[in-house]
């Protein structure tokens, strides 16, 4: 595939997404269409559009644009979101010496989005709440640093409590240019509004006053990371760890195979797994998530984003992102559940590199978290260790799919591919596999790559 055909393929995919009301772009395009109709009818001497024309713009979507002033403001959001989509075209590496497309960036985005009302634009579902900035400030004690429970590339996450006693997590976009913040907000909003599964975080509303905020339901337990590596670690019995592993795997199967379009999360880690009151895991933070069209085997990205310790080799070597990127990160998460160790310790020691020799020797007693003592199910421990070993394989081709991971965790070890599946997988031997096969990859190079990425991240 040359760069021109890749470019054309992405343009075709964009057009298809515009026609699909169940995709983020389809929903946003429908809203923008209605906004344009409303704007044109209010500023023209021509007769207003008939009811049928307006209904067509709303057909098969939950999007509604009711207020002209709000529509005008959100129109700026949509244009920035669309521009960001076009920027992704440049992620295809040019071949045959072709020059990459030049995308001009508008640096004059209007950052003043105060007073915009969510329900004037969207009516995703009846339970979606439109929070005011005062609601959010009261809930988080004016964004007190003590209430920070997570940090990301563009945002901080605060825990809060509403007047009725409901706990919430507030993701507040604080970093980047106004354009970048807007793009990140719309990208994540476009995904989470279409995600609904017991093992994904419950999105309950937004606040677009005084900045951009996404609000999620939170339980007193907080995140897996805070329990696993914090003072409340004793609460995580083996049975709970095993159920967290299985529930998180179910959530990833939903994202990869159960959604209308494949979703690659790209930032699976202990801090991004919320736990409900009964210790059920919920995947959260879709800020880095990508929709992967069915025509494509992978995305190529030029900007490294995510969390050190969870990067798959093909990602930080070649910028390749697909379902197996999440599988690798899930393997690291399994190791955290087994060992109680973080993905990177205080000395920057990689959990993967520490655990691999023990996995190869099947030294499970040396792997298991000492705080558990002998209070674990040996059969389940063997399942988790063997599955983790497969998930963190250097070769993305040799890693299982998440649906296979679930079967392995359940003890269905006779997971085999049909001849057709095997043939498809042989045909899909890409790019990530061929590039990894072309170099000898070892622990020293792994650490060297991590160091280089760390230097780039700190310098940017």
Swiss-Prot record:
Reactions catalysed: L-seryl-[protein] + ATP = O-phospho-L-seryl-[protein] + ADP + H(+); L-threonyl-[protein] + ATP = O-phospho-L-threonyl-[protein] + ADP + H(+)
Location, primary (coarse class): cytoplasm
Annotated ranges, domain Protein kinase: 143-415
One Gene Ontology cellular component annotation held by this UniProt entry: cytoplasm
Superkingdom classification of source: Eukaryota
Keyword Kinase on entry: yes
Oligomer and partners: Interacts with ARAC5 and ARAC10.
The protein's name in its UniProt record: Receptor-like cytosolic serine/threonine-protein kinase RBK2
Organism (species): Arabidopsis thaliana
Gene name of this polypeptide: RBK2
